[in-house]
Swiss-Prot record:
Its EC number is 5.4.2.10. GO terms for biological process: carbohydrate metabolic process; peptidoglycan biosynthetic process; UDP-N-acetylglucosamine biosynthetic process. It catalyses: alpha-D-glucosamine 1-phosphate = D-glucosamine 6-phosphate. Its cofactor is Mg(2+). Binds 1 Mg(2+) ion per subunit. Catalyzes the conversion of glucosamine-6-phosphate to glucosamine-1-phosphate. The active site is at residue 107. The keyword Transcription does not apply. The lineage of its organism: Bacteria, Pseudomonadati, Pseudomonadota, Betaproteobacteria, Burkholderiales. Keywords: Isomerase, Magnesium, Metal-binding, Phosphoprotein. SUPFAM superfamilies: Phosphoglucomutase, C-terminal domain, Phosphoglucomutase, first 3 domains. GO terms for cellular component: cytosol. The modification Phosphoserine is found at residue 107. This is Phosphoglucosamine mutase.
């Protein structure tokens, strides 16, 4: 069933434009509240309570107030955490035994975008069925709760402290970060007052950048999607590592002392190696269609099965649950360790990488010795709306030729964009010139 508002990661858009307007968000809070209330009544749980967290965008205040009004109008109690990473909201929702959690964030997008994302009582993303129920409720007229049945709202002061302690609890008790200097880039986002405490309290010397949010500078020149300042600061301070999070701190990028950047594909490999070195069985891991082939081949050579999900951490999570595995991720830095947290968490992922390095006594470069990422060439080709690339004869003929010639030493991925009339042509090969050659040949058939 197609949905009108919910995408693969909640509802997102430009602030002030539908659907990210205060009137719609109020109705959204009411609709979600009605669905939660019906569920609570059916299970005899009484009045539901939700947690609302947000990142540091200026529009967060406006949307928080609208959500609060909608939920309380539906008879739902509300707790508000203030700025808190998305995975922090997921954790507290589960830890406080709440009915649901809501995050106001547009992740790595600029400040003028925002979004709404829901978590279930278990800290997981809402099932499609529940999102569809909320959309159906949005189409109905609002019927407010009686005056004596309205919800109550209050702020909780210890949300950040609770989450800091939870993050630290995922780091092995017999390890510490004494003697390490770490640069942290919080993207002027939700981790700005969280991440420095986590790593400092575990013993590291911390240098913080991207930690002065003003409501309009989130992700602007800082964070996981713009690592140049992290690379510069890591070199300048002679740090052992640099860690970058995005605006809501659910993704991670890492820089070593030489300024080399490590993406999520490589970090997933590091986490698998750490488990195997500790004697833990790792039957398989999940990446995406975009995960570098070198990582897949390296894992398979060690007997670790590798499955590719559609792009998006939601789909990685689905595959992990289907196979009963624990570790997955994508190159953008969304990493999942399901025995540590129910959702992707940049801080916790960083701690797992650090634990691997401390336990082994190796650097990232040493752990990844022998894993040489294949060069990738990506070309975006504009096409007519509704274009079916699978029925394009010239493209299919060129595709057969390129796949035959690559013959296991590379791969081709062709997929349409989900947001614009574009077909993405990506070729991966051990030789960069070869990747470019085949990508250009394939793209030329569409031009």
């Amino acid at each position: 069933m197609s949905r009108k508002y919910f995408g693969t990661d909640g509802i997102r858009g430009r602030v002030g434009e539908s659907p990210i307007t205060p009137d719609f968000v109020l109705r959204l809070g009411y609709a979600a509240g009605r669905v939660l209330a019906h569920g609570s009544e059916a299970h005899g749980h009484g009045r539901p309570t939700v947690l609302i967290g947000k990142d540091t965008r200026l529009s967060g205040y406006m949307l928080e107030a609208a959500l609060e009004a909608g939920f309380t109008a539906a008879g739902v109690d509300v707790l508000m955490s203030g700025p808190l990473p998305t995975p922090g909201v997921a954790y507290l929702t589960r830890a406080l035994r709440l009915s649901a959690g809501v995050v106001i964030s547009a992740s790595h997008n600029p400040y003028y975008d925002n979004g709404i994302k829901f978590f279930s009582a278990t800290g997981d993303k809402l099932p499609d069925e529940t999102e569809s129920q909320i959309e159906a409720e949005l189409e109905k007229p609002m019927v407010y709760a009686a005056s004596d049945a309205l919800g109550r709202a209050r702020r909780i002061d210890d949300a950040a402290g609770r989450y800091i302690e939870f993050c630290k609890s995922t780091f092995p008790n017999d390890l510490n970060l004494f003697g390490m200097k770490i640069v942290l880039d919080s993207a002027h986002g939700a981790a700005y007052h969280i991440a420095p405490h986590v790593f400092h309290e575990l013993g590291a010397e911390v240098v913080s950048i991207g930690n002065q949010p003003n409501g309009r500078n989130i992700n602007d020149g800082y964070g996981a999607t713009e690592p140049a300042k992290l690379i510069e600061a890591t070199r300048q301070h002679g740090a052992d590592l640099g860690l970058a999070f995005d605006g809501d701190a659910d993704r991670l990028q890492v820089v070593d002392r030489n300024g080399r950047l490590y993406n999520g594909d490589e970090l997933l490999y590091v986490m698998v190696q750490a488990r195997r070195a500790a004697g833990q069985a790792v039957p398989g891991a999940v990446g995406t269609l975009m995960t570098n082939l070198a990582v897949e081949l390296a894992l398979k050579a060690q007997g670790v099965e590798f499955v590719r999900a559609k792009v998006g951490d939601r789909y990685v999570l689905e595959e992990l649950k289907k196979h009963g595995w624990l570790l997955g991720g994508e190159g953008s830095g969304h990493l999942l360790c399901l025995d540590k947290h129910s959702t992707g968490d940049g801080i916790i992922s960083a701690l797992q990488v650090l634990a691997a390095l401390r336990r082994s006594g190796q650097t990232l470069e040493q752990v990844l010795d022998g894993v040489h990422l294949f060069p990738q060439k990506l070309i975006n080709v504009r096409v007519e709306k509704g274009f079916d690339w699978k029925a394009h004869a010239a493209l299919q003929a060129a595709l057969k030729v390129s796949e035959a010639e690559l013959n296991g030493k590379g791969r081709v991925l062709i997929r349409p964009s989900g947001t614009e009339p574009v077909v993405r042509v990506m070729v991966e090969a051990q030789d960069a010139a070869l990747a470019t050659k085949y990508a250009e040949q394939l793209a030329a058939t569409l031009q």
